[in-house]
């Protein structure tokens, strides 16, 4: 049938483009990025320049007004382990239901943070995700808040300031931690860290001026990272520097783009947030509300290469004998949809929901996630939720599909007339097309009706792919049996007898059980209709399920399961509708024809 062929060909081309892009661009780029990351890490580890001497008892010397201190480029990189790097400085412990780590008293940095609920792999003994690491490590990654002063203010808190703990030495949701520092100009800085049960820290800085004259100083915050993800990001989502500030709104700078541009500085703002984001994790700063600040995104090449998102407030004036307080919120954790949305609403963080990259088609992707997540709460399994979502989508669009398949059935009835027209005007394509249109008009057939299943299938397919790819809720979400991660490809393979033969196979040969099921269901669905008379189209229909089986093998298992289940439902739906319309279902005849001996050309 003409329209059904168009249906499959359109779907095939759409998925083929995505698969070819993933196989020939994403995978090689990922491998190249992993190798580049390995080389860079080796280079960093070999780089052992002497650290600049620093007096641990003093604050950071006052830099020029309006500048933000950034991590020294030539500092020492330790080849020791993480534990040794942490032991090199005094610390305050962090212990919450979601986080564990410590605050470095040198600089009052958040540079040691692990996520309790997330591990590197699905293995039970897999280590927890290390989100933040000390600067001395090749994977240095931290958040820091400080001040910029002048000669009048004296030394103000910065990267090298050693703070004193006042009271409680452990930060938890119920026990804030207070740090203090006093300089020789009569300025006392009191910093209070508090944290909720999830991933949000609140840093409250009070500056008490005990001197005899007013002072002005600036508050800054920065998220600095020395490495970048080993696996390259794709156009499916953004990884790198990010922020939403002022009237310019969302700013996204991939690692490669900021390496080229070196620095980007949007206009001043009085609200918003900025930081660095990965696929599943992020570290962001939310400056004091209504306090004007200058955001910046930068890449530094002096010494160790590093990426930085930072802000610098306007001058904060503190009269003699008075005090001033500024507050900065720091998000450091997993990009869980519900928590991100709650922070945006409860804390009035403007468009904080954009920390999750829903893409241009967010109006489809977000409802798709909401539906899957809602069903998960009832079913307790994301795989079952995906299957239930497919049923609901099919049911919602059943009336439209009914009309579409009814039109296809009518097209089958006029198939003989269409063949006559093709034979009659075989050498005149223009007249053939005109005759076809006249036939459609006479028989009251809409040849475009068969496109509706395609129009519905493609956005659902891509939105589900996006949900599986970007949302942390799908990460390590099990289905049943061997599928322990719906966001990863099916780990089995036909070519090693599904694990019975202990051999490591290349990516292109990892044809698992679910891709095979998907291929079989696609084959059956295509055989529901007559074999195309055109030899080229017939060959496409014959080989398309095989090609798709190989292509889909590298996609997330959740997407392949959806595709196979959708094929099954489509077979059932098409069979019911065609039977109602009195159209012949060609499935059994086509299957029997596969086993019949084909006549030789001489016969």
Swiss-Prot record:
Superkingdom of the source species: Bacteria
Region Disordered, residue ranges: 38-76
Subcellular location: Cell inner membrane
GO-annotated molecular function: membrane insertase activity
Keyword Transmembrane: yes
Example GO biological process: protein insertion into membrane
Membrane topology: Multi-pass membrane protein
Principal location listed in the UniProt entry: membrane
One Pfam family matching this protein: 60KD_IMP
CC terms in the record's Gene Ontology section: plasma membrane
Keyword Chaperone: yes
Spans traversing the lipid bilayer: 7-27, 352-372, 378-398, 452-472, 497-517, 540-560
Low complexity composition bias: residue spans: 52-74
Keywords (A to Z) from UniProt: Cell inner membrane, Cell membrane, Chaperone, Membrane, Protein transport, Transmembrane, Transmembrane helix, Transport
InterPro entries in the record: Membr_insert_YidC (IPR019998), Membr_insert_YidC_N (IPR028053), YidC/ALB3/OXA1/COX18 (IPR001708), YidC/Oxa/ALB_C (IPR028055), YidC_ALB_C (IPR047196), YidC_periplasmic_sf (IPR038221)
Composition bias type Basic and acidic residues, residue spans: 38-51
Subunit structure: Interacts with the Sec translocase complex via SecD. Specifically interacts with transmembrane segments of nascent integral membrane proteins during membrane integration.
Family according to the record: Belongs to the OXA1/ALB3/YidC family. Type 1 subfamily.
Known function: Required for the insertion and/or proper folding and/or complex formation of integral membrane proteins into the membrane. Involved in integration of membrane proteins that insert both dependently and independently of the Sec translocase complex, as well as at least some lipoproteins. Aids folding of multispanning membrane proteins.
Protein name: Membrane protein insertase YidC
